[in-house]
Amino acid sequence: EKEYIEELDSTGYYFVHNKTKAKVFYLENTDEIKTFSIGFRTPPKDSTGVAHIVEHTVLSGSRKYRTKEPFMDLVNSSLQTFLNAMTFPDKTIYPIASRNVKDFYNLMDVYLDAVFYPRIYEEEKIFYQEGWHYEMEDLDSPIKYNGVVYNEMRGAYSDPDDQVSEIISEALHPGSTYSHDSGGNPHHIPDLTYEDFLNFHKKYYHPSNSYIFLNGAMDIEEVLAYIDEEYLGNFDYLEVNSKINQGQSENKIEILDKTYSIGAGEKEENKAYYVYGLTLGPSTSPMDRFMRSILEDIIIESDSSILKDKFLESGLCEDYFSQVSTSISQDFFIVGKNGDGKSLDKLVKIIEDGLKQAVEEKIDQDLLAATLNSFEFSTKDLGIHKGVLLNISCLRSWLYDASPIEALKYKDTLAHIKENLDKGIVEEYIEEKILNNPRKIQMTVRPKPGEFLEKDKGQEEKLRAYKESLSQEEKENLVKETQDLFEYQTKLDSKEDKATIPKLDLKDISPGVSHLDTEVIKDGDKDLVFTRAFTNGIYNMTMSFDLKNIKAADLPYVSVVFDLLGSLDTENYSYKDLNNQVDIHTGGISFSPAIYQNPKTLAYKVQGNLRGRTMEDKIDKYLDL
């Protein structure tokens, strides 16, 4: 499959590896930052955090790269612009990026070796270090749980917002892949055995279940040949069942009452959460994805949103927020935070009455235009990590057996929404997908002091009983295993192991710098500087003013003046109207003074800068503002 994607000024190539059926998607363009990523569909069947632990452990040494932390070694020895790994609710990805060709190959090779040939099969201590292990310092000490992911998730679960988010996912998708925490619940992580951990890797980390993404200017035939010869060609096809369990949720409104944990000594008053949640249904459609993001802003997140003032006037909660999922389930929920725990029905009424009113009376067109404008900028401007973000974007369709190109093309969808803004497209979507949605949860999540402490005590009792069940010899072995793990963790890598980590020589680094296509035009005493580059229709503009005539005594006031610019009424607009017009027609306008020093003469120059962004069809309005 080959298709030009106008929105990205890129040509997409979709390949399937002959032998293993590994899936490869390449975006050919002029981006000097070359991006590679390999991902796997990794649906969890419980909350032991196995997907998260595997992500950590495969980066702890492999067949070729023998140090304990090749990942951190690469951070210090490469020219990478991105190097990370990420666990999602249903997938795990390993993206890297670099401008340097040799560095790109080095990073790609380290990651491919890591995912396909990790040391986890030969060194059990990697699992104990990164996942969890029993720890007993001496015969008189109690047995404890310890481990990198275990401790990380204990920290995550201390945040009430994170707890509530997991409770919502479980409530919306009972019995499904999304009812489990792929990151790991700290009270379930110790249920994971070393054998189950290895089996998870064996099952899912196979080329037949892989999604390989490439972006940028590169010799794609050479790259594909390398991946095939060094890795994919060493495997045979394997039928991998990585199907995502969508669950069997009933189409009904559920009124739920749950609890989350707070500190044992904390007060419970006004710490309840209210949740109004629903799922828009399985979809890889750009329209559904776009509309969900737009609805977030229009309904609650924007200062001018439909419900913001109504929420604040009600006094039911201290704060409100909404959230959308990144998976196929298309979740959308509104949360009221720090309420009295008695007002769920009032909050639901505010939400549904407010949305019904918006549908009947129509949403303010300026709010719609400003929201869509903001969304368009965020969609088009991906920044320096563009390749990684495109990888995540294409998986929104690709992971669910649709074309990766589907999630990247948005021009027609965006145009359709723009053309129909004043014809009720958003109002119709709210009515159909939210108000008339047959599957909703309305939930109160109450604070329970010491809830985690109770679970911790249960674990401590379990560990106490486990210690009592051990013979003297088994206890001595556990103390020795604790000491052995500590020695493994603190032992420095050998010179031989360090030598396996790829490094760049000076000859591998180009001494030149990238040059932009820039033109300078003289207009009287002004210099007009034009830089040409693919910006997806976004015009970035800077206007600089020489402030040499300002007296030295007045310089402290310059920053005050620039802070006030854009925050005051003008000749043509009130402050509120001005900001509204800026939101509708630009990607933001900022004002800032700057002081520059000539490195030769050491003379100073004070300058005022106006920076802003706009779309091609809005330049005149931008300049007017």
Language model regions located:
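Alpha-helical scaffold elements lining the catalytic groove of polysaccharide deacetylases
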Residues: L192-T193, F197
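M16 family metallopeptidases and their MPP-like homologs
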Residues: E32-P43, E69-Y117, E124-E135, D162-H187, ...
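His/Glu-rich zincin catalytic helix
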Residues: E1-F71, P95-R99, D109-V110, S158, ...
